[in-house]
Amino acid sequence: MNSSNPRYGLVDREYGIQLATTSPADDGPVWMVNLMKYREVADYVDGRKTTISGQAADDLYSPIDSLTAVGAEIVFLGDVDQQLLGDNTVWDRIAVVKYPTRKSFIDMQARPEFQESHKHKDAGMDKTFVIGCQPLQAAEPPPDLEPLDWADVPHPPTKDDGPVVVMHVLRFEDVDAGVQTPAYMEAYK
């Protein structure tokens, strides 16, 4: 890994500078969505021989202490069960981390324990996207929407079922159009 970019992705330097230099008056929480694709076998840059998987190496990385030190919290962590739609990348894991400020995201990366454990992430990751987000207000359901009768569903949920989380990550080719809901998503409203 060089000082600019890890082997598993390209750093958007402009966004990094924005995160680091946002004035305290304008700063606030940021949610970082992490899409992770692991190497089949971990590949350490120091040349050590290993048979552990990329996911196992990333589990060694686990930056819980660094996150806690800057006031961040993991709000979602899950292994991908199914990928319904997307390009050629089939993601293995998704994490969403809420940082109290944009600067705290940068501060975490300067912590010695983070830098020491990062070698495991570098060894484990084939590719990752880290996407800074701000939550949107969910649309209110139409007033005439009737609740679903689970008796009409072939495989209704049971009290033993866990939650299902669906994450839809959009990439807009036309950044100016990114503030508008794509026409094909109007049906979701």
Please provide the spans of the model-predicted regions.
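Short S/T/G/P-rich N-terminal loop/turn motif that feeds into the first structured element of a domain
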Residues: 1-93, 100-108, 124-189
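A common structural junction motif
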Residues: 113-119, 125
